[in-house]
Amino acid sequence: DDSLREQAVLIEKELERRGRIDRIDTQGMADPEIRVEFDATRIAALGLSPSDVATTVQTYFQDLAAGELDVAGSNWLVRLKGKSTDAFDLNRFPILGRDGSLRVGDVARVTRTQAERSELVRYEGKPSVLLAVMKAEGANTLELIDEVKDYIETHNELEAVTGTRLVLIDDQTIPTRKALNIMQNNALIGLMLVLVVAWIFLGLKIATLTAIGIPFILAGTFWILQGMDQTLNVTVLLGVVIALGMLVDDAVVVVEAIYYRVERGFSGIDAVLDALKETVAPVTAAVLTTVAAFLPLMLLPGILGKFMMVIPLVVSVALLISLVEAFWMLPGHVLGAGMKLDRDGKTQQFRTRLNRGIRHVYMRLLIRALRRPFTTLAISVCALFGAVGLLASGQIRADFFASDPIRVFYVNIETEPGTRLERTLNLTLEIEKVVRANLGEGEARGVVAYAGQQFTETEPLRGSHRGQVLVGLQPDGREVTDIINEMRESVRAVPGPSRVTFLELAGGPPSSKPISIKVRGSDFSELRAAADEIRNILHNTAGVKDVSDDAQDGRFALQLTLDPDQVARSGLLPADIARNIRILVDGEIVESVQDQGETVDIRVVAADGQFSSPTQLLGAQLPTATGDMISLSELVNADRSPTFGTIRHYNFRRTITVEADIDSEITDTVTSNQSVMEAWGQLQASYPTVNLDFSGELDDIQESLDSIGILFIFGLGVMYLILGTQFKSFGQPLLILVTVPLAFTGVVLGLFVTGNPLSLYTLYGVVALSGIAVNSAIVMISAANDRLIAGMGLKHATLYAARRRVVPIVITVLTTIAGLFSLAAGLGGTSLIWGPVATAIVWGLGFSSVLTLFVVPLLYYLTGRRREIRLNSGT
């Protein structure tokens, strides 16, 4: 153990010298200690008390600065030195109050050893030390773990010399690397799809000119983010993926307008200037409305808000920079390249036929819609109500905190309070054997068993009756949930532990348990009974698993109170009696000394094995003021009784928190909590002083839903103000915002078709989508208004704007969808966190754009007709 500890300390120091590491937390490593262990019976026979031994050591074993001495004009420091790192020096100290013939070594055994352990760790059955490496602020996590791996490899080459081997049990960068790879792959695929769409509709040269601004936009975005102390992480990459398709939207609209004019014989400079005149206002309004939808999401409170705050920042910065690229750099590129149509080959002929075909088919359908306006509107309304019906009927599965699992899980073991640490460790090792038997060959990177501590999702729990098995899995293999379900029954069949639960970690923002119920009351026995009822309810609720609570049964205690009369007659001071009791039971740290950078405590304590029962302790003898001996039982009143364990309070009342996990394939957070509420309603009368507070993930969901709703309304309000300023109208912004419920319809349809759950990330995507979906309507209504100002009739202007804008709308919608399609479909890797955001935008934008092409012109025409009729009747 000493050599293991020395190696662990050496490794800890070597790692901490590296700049990327903030600190290293150790587990299973006891502190060094010098113990002065006396025989209580022997010192009593010599007329000594435990405090005599402790005071002797404390008095001699000290360093004292006595001041300065003036010696021939120089100041000399005067120090009294008594401390030593040699444990045997303590043996020579004479017991105070004696003639010097009796020394510490005559009544006690002095040894250099280790403090009593509060934790025991085993790896493959061998004593081990766990070292948890914490990175310094701003350090690159991936570089740090690579550095640690190199250190492990170098250290293990010297295993024959050091006698120790390092094993990496838990690598938290594995999910990070996986997520980064998913984002990078999907970003690359998305970029390629964007270029393909632009090439199909606009040709290679124009597609290249459109895409050439993307590196500039991303470089500017990353430069600004670096100035704001942001790092490149998964959420930043998600913002890039979301923005990727939209980055070329501005350029597509501008370059399509230029392309349209070149087709009609405009010169290069005239085509650019006329196109900019037409597109600056609507494109700027479209970008600002998108920013208005995204930016308020930075104000989202709670865990979800902190985790995803950077996404709207990335998207907003990138979109604003894209305006600079579209209105300044792109026209320069176009003029420099000499905007000409591609050669009149088969590809260009196909492109021309495609654009004309889209306009022709669209105009035929739009004219039919204008002839049957109420049928078209009825279809849209029915689609909206159908989406609401799918949600209300439960056809869309809800999993508000859907997350990607981490390849690590824990098996938690609890025994009866007061169980010795060694006994708990032995039971934990039995559990470890069963766990290993249920794992495939090479499936685990490492399995560690330890007692005295349990890691949780929030804070570690300590106690000699707690044990835990940590299982680190290989990056690829069976799902963590499947592994746990397969071994659950066999692990729980191991005799001995009073409770066995599993803890499965998940990626994404930290979240509470799906079920977390605070049982509050004043009477502890009634509170305990009510908590047991809640546990029974949860055990009988479908889809609920790993039920636990934080109530701790107390251990038996020997309660001692001083007898004032007896204490007075003995002539002993109460403080001296209390000190002697502490020295007899747990010992007293009388001093400490520094040795090679470590603090070594000096503990005076009765030798082990002297007090195996309360009776033996109470029989300990203490010398009185007259020199007579008196037993401890004569000085104190003793009461043997059970005690309460940890008693927690919430809002000034005693509280037991009952928690459980759920199988999201069977139930969801809201449904399972509702089941408990209904079952408790039938039992509540039996527990009049007890009430329940439902918190945990339910609180997080409610907070996020409330906040997302408020920010959604706020974003719509800002969008309305921007559109009102752009169009100088109160009514036309409302026509544009009609696209938002249409987008919601598409999101619900997408969830239903793909089988994805409704999560808070999906709702996040819906709010973001509200700013994207309006862009098509903006450019269409802007074109119609321009035609009206130019003197066209209402119907002619509506049809002209629709025909003129349908191709750029199709292109921008397809490029946005193309940028996110890979992430939504999982082409470059799947994610339960980011996939729903992309799915919401892809389906919502696709569905709303189709309806927008018909509903917006129709509403524009109908409201315009109504205004004309009102004006004519007024005249």
Residue ranges with predicted function:
Residues 279, 348-399, 517, 803:
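Signature of alpha-helical transmembrane segments and their immediate interfacial
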Residues 244-258, 279-299, 306-348, 469, ...:
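Transmembrane alpha-helices and their membrane-interface boundaries in multi-pass membrane transporters
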Residues 12-189, 199, 255, 535-715, ...:
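Extracytoplasmic/periplasmic membrane-proximal domains and adjacent transmembrane bundles
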Residues 169, 176, 180, 255, ...:
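Helix-loop junctions and hydrophobic alpha-helical segments within the transmembrane domains
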